[in-house]
Amino acid sequence: PEWLGQTLGEIQNVLAPLSSPNDQKRWNQRLKDLEDVLKPNTLWRAPHTSATKGIPSVRIHPNYILEVEGEHRALPLNQTISEALLCGTERLPGIAEFIQLEGRVVEEKGYKPEQIEVLFENWKRCVPASWTSRKALSTVLGGAWIWRYYDVLVVTAESVLYGDEARYDSSQKWLKDVSRLQAHLGVLRVWKSGVWVGITTMVVAYYAWQLETLSTINSVGLAVLGSIISIGSNLLYWKKDPPAF
């Protein structure tokens, strides 16, 4: 996992200066294109931070590693046939290509969570820091999980194309858990709304003091309550954000 993570990270780091801005509209359309064809009974869209940028697609696969003069070399691959047939030509973020590698090492090599962690840390060490910031990897802002969903949709399409029933069943089992993750994200959005409730409370306290409808003490108390609600909601929101790995 160390070599695979580092190799992908080094390749992507070279491509980073060629990156294009956040293209979340087309990335979400890409998900819709797959959903429309596959009919998976799931629907997921996500925002993405400005740090999430598209890069030229270069993938590596654990089954396509060569040894040249005693050193390992990765054979670069294109996107899958299913993606070429069903999706657009937009660039994907570096995290999307990492998740694609994660999916293949789990499928082909049986990697366990601790090995995935090593893979991720070695990749993270080589790519721009902004790509792996807390917000860039936040599940409520897309992060790694939306690209796992994308990868499983692609796996579903590939399994249908090649008649791979075992792989199809595995992808369907994964997709059944999507609704539970989305329900959790829905709860987080409720907590996030508490931030605006708190801000509104502070604004009301200010104008109530200005209009003298509340005493200074009561206005200050209301403003403090609003700030507690706002700060507390924001802390809970980020604390409960599902970890990327």
Predicted features and spans:
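C-terminal end-of-chain micro-motif
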Residues: L85, A244-F245
